[in-house]
Design a protein with these regions (language model features):
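Acidic/histidine-rich helix-loop elements
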Residues: 1, 22
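Glycine-rich, highly charged phosphate/nucleotide-binding loops
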Residues: 2-5, 30
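Active-site metal-binding motif and surrounding structural segment of the metallo-beta-lactamase
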Residues: 4-16
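His/Asp/Glu-rich metal-coordinating catalytic cores
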Residues: 13, 24-166
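Active-site rim/loop-helix segments in enzyme catalytic domains that contact anionic ligands
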Residues: 19
Length: 166
């Protein structure tokens, strides 16, 4: 399991970049099992909602079960972007919660340019557009946006393949 790997490999943090759940109709028992798994590690876990587990008015992350989440689980909920600071790691994590998976949603929009001397990791859940892509997809992420991103590391979610987009 991913949680076991974080502990075994001595990871500083667990990043969950969207689509942790396939849809918002997941039973509470599954959500409780997820929270129990996260509670097994001492490292912080940061979760960014994606297109399958949106952060909207009916979000599963707003259910009662998440009112009792472990202290190490941090959920990005701001749809215009949010930075979480982890001073003990000299690290800030920024992301933009997805409220709607449409071409109008730009996952990297609003990333802060001001730095406080910490490393900055950005989380973005969307469709990476190669230069030769002709179609307009929802939640687009374009190469110039990545090149201009003022972060030290960008963790992308949504695609199910390994691609270096640096």
């Amino acid at each position: 399991a991913v949680v076991d790997a974080v502990a075994r490999l001595g990871g500083d943090m667990l990043l969950l970049v969207g689509d942790v759940f396939d849809h918002g109709r997941v039973p509470d028992s599954v959500l409780e099992a997820f929270l129990e798994e996260i509670a097994r590690i001492s490292q912080p876990a940061v979760l960014l909602p994606g297109n399958h587990d949106l952060y909207d008015d009916n979000s599963l992350y707003q259910r009662e079960v998440f009112q009792h989440k472990p202290d190490n689980l941090h959920i990005i909920t701001q749809t215009d972007g949010e930075a979480l600071s982890f001073p003990e790691l000299t690290l800030d994590v920024w992301g933009r919660a997805m409220v709607s998976h449409t071409p109008a949603f730009h996952p990297l929009e609003g990333m802060p340019t001001q730095r406080n001397g910490h490393w900055m990791v950005a989380l973005a859940h969307g469709h990476f557009h190669f230069d030769d892509d002709r179609d307009q997809r929802s939640s687009p992420i374009y190469p110039p946006e990545i090149a201009a991103a003022p972060c030290d590391y960008l963790a992308l979610g949504h695609w199910d393949r390994h691609v270096d987009v640096s």
